[in-house]
Curated annotation (Swiss-Prot):
SUPFAM superfamilies reported for this sequence: Mitochondrial carrier
Gene3D superfamilies for the chain: Mitochondrial carrier domain
Full protein name: Putative mitochondrial transporter UCP3
Region listing for Purine nucleotide binding, in residue ranges: 278-300
Membrane spanning residue stretches: 11-32, 77-99, 120-136, 183-199, 217-236, 271-293
Solcar repeats: 11-105, 114-205, 214-299
Superkingdom of this protein's organism: Eukaryota
A UniProt-annotated Pfam family: Mito_carr
Membrane topology listed for this record: Multi-pass membrane protein
Subcellular localization, as worded in the UniProt entry: Mitochondrion inner membrane
GO terms (BP aspect): adaptive thermogenesis; fatty acid metabolic process; lipid hydroperoxide transport; mitochondrial transmembrane transport; response to cold; response to superoxide
Keyword hit for Membrane: yes
Any one GO cellular component localisation term in the record: mitochondrial inner membrane
Amino acid sequence: MVGLQPSERPPTTSVKFLAAGTAACFADLLTFPLDTAKVRLQIQGENQAALAARSAQYRGVLGTILTMVRTEGPRSLYSGLVAGLQRQMSFASIRIGLYDSVKQFYTPKGSDHSSIITRILAGCTTGAMAVTCAQPTDVVKIRFQASMHTGLGGNRKYSGTMDAYRTIAREEGVRGLWKGILPNITRNAIVNCGEMVTYDIIKEKLLDYHLLTDNFPCHFVSAFGAGFCATLVASPVDVVKTRYMNSPPGQYHSPFDCMLKMVTQEGPTAFYKGFTPSFLRLGSWNVVMFVTYEQMKRALMKVQMLRDSPF
């Protein structure tokens, strides 16, 4: 079947770390417009006065993308990409690259099988660790994605990615770069469990029952299932996180206040705003990322083995 075959030696932690960050950046490059559309749909309706002043209304994934291209230009779909890539190199490297190592750490000595609880603990741990390191990049990414640039008074607040870090720190304090870290930790712990644990289990069962071999089709099916589960369980927290991180100072007192206002003003369905682009983005992102990740691990191990070989 297509793809590199597994290496004789299991991949090292450093190989997984590098492969995860690189694969996540590649997945971001391909799916970033869907992520931007998701952010626009999630924040739509949170400020009715601002919404009424906008000429652009978003309806559905394709409608959002087409509206953005028409009113802001195609480059708007990739607004915040630099921060997004910075985020993945610091975020995915930890939550994906260290997952197996943390899973082994939680697995009791003498056991050759990791329980579901062990995998969930590993997913929560690496997800929380990754957010703690990458939170400022996520804040900047969302600020860029949420801002409209129409040329009709929609001037850019930030001249670039580094200017965004400096401006947020100057105007909102250093804490502004860590705004929404609690809902983000919650969201990414859930997403990481949904992604890594589901991928781990589906892949394991497909191989145990000899339904597929350890190659592209197996990785594709496992990644698609992981993307759906992650979107389903994490969407409510993701909407709250996006709105809170994008909000101006004083709009919400806390993530909990943001959640209450969403329920009272828009109803419980607001928690699943942007679900379709979330799934399209997370599902496609997972497929691209995990397939690339598996192949990169094998390629890097082959390079390492060739380098270590005396001949």
